[in-house]
């Protein structure tokens, strides 16, 4: 048997062995795949009400899979008995169940407050689950490096990378090969085959790749010497060349550039936009430490030079990055970018100091500090969602009090227009706070301040934006949507007494239009409800609301007939582009010019845009 065939056979043997070695982890991965298959089977109109449930299950099984990996490795490497193995698997399943219960009961958004049709997993809940996955995986790597006689953190760290890329390669080959066969079947035998077949293939390939990943690791049982460990931990010759002769010189060159920038900053001041600087610096700090761990056991001259130079150079560069951070905080206060960069900076400084003091023995401590930072970032008071908002609230309060616009916990419009810098700072803080989620806001703050008219009414001046340092617009990828436009045709409006143009409503600051009828004056409101724009029609007769209806039922009707997809716009008849609403006093027909429903699959966000052409109304 040649080497290539033997390696393939060993990979799949390891995958089957993973079911015995990590049963809870593989079980969670299988459940994850089953949930994915169910989601594939359901179209968006059927899936949308269940989206929150499915996302909770996905996160729960992801946490359970990685937590089980860590728990079983701890049990095997430290105890190696049946009782510890059983407990670790029960803990893994329990972690998945606990994550689901917490996320399902406490991790959802409020549809009414957020303007969504259904609850979604909040960003904070997803971040906490992500932190649990990260911490579990780091703990797995730490304990996979025991005993010290056979391994260490650097070797275990590389082994995890190696297992990942081998599993990724096999998964891509499986998916590509199976998709090719499916494509041949579709082209030659069954042209009506559903496109979902390819999604099922991708799901199965992902599950098999995970089993290959888990099965690649050696026997971690205490007292066992597995010859496979040495092979799994060993860096192939091409990897040594990649790290020592290519990546190390690149990072050393970047180090030189950043050191030159540091010297230039001393002479000419800080001129680089903070967003750009923070991204470069964060990449350098994280990537530099990662590479330092990877070349721990290399004896190449470049690798030895890098291990000596990097900690000192990083300290110098991090000192200047701290200067840039202080300037940014003085100018704009603490926001999510500054918060994230501060955490990375603290971890990086601690890491390079530890590398100088303890050399390669610092790796486990650095990993634990990283775990602490991940947990800290999602804590109730100090997390990314709370601390920046609290900082901006304090900043805004100081600005408003200085202008006499906040007294006794109540806002008051400015009697005189503040100077430009103050208006810019107030606008910047207001918009950041209004856009925040999962954070407690003071009673005096109204989230509608993000609207131009509310802002001017309550603060006494127009929103004034500071000049942006950079403009970074990007779509996270993937498009799924429904786009309809009204077919040119006549509209039967016989029997209706009034025709209301939407421009008449939009042109008024309060989005209100009055119509005089036999029963009295009707007030018509057409509210677009940003950010997700599920429109709401409200009609009042005097002071009484006689009709209040959102477009959820109409959206259900549209998505059932035109499920969101990747195609372009569709022409639709008047029957599809209109909706009739009735109340005891009036009958209303809404006619739309175009409707756009956009789905962001990565974030499970659905936004709606409904362009109203005319509103027709008659008394009953």
Label each PLM-derived region with a short phrase.
Residues 240, 244, 254-327:
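Hydrophobic alpha-helical segments
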Residues 407-620:
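Extracytosolic and intramembrane catalytic regions of membrane-associated proteins
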Residues 39-59, 78-84, 106-130, 187-200, ...:
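Membrane-helix interface and helix-disruption motif detector
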Residues 177, 307-358:
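Membrane-embedded alpha-helical segments of integral membrane proteins
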Residues 1-100:
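N-terminal signal-anchor module of multipass membrane proteins
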Residues 361-384:
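Internal/C-terminal transmembrane anchor helices
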Residues 48-49, 78-88, 102-241:
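Membrane-interface helix-loop-helix junctions at boundaries between adjacent transmembrane segments
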Residues 377-403:
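Hydrophobic alpha-helical transmembrane segments in integral membrane proteins
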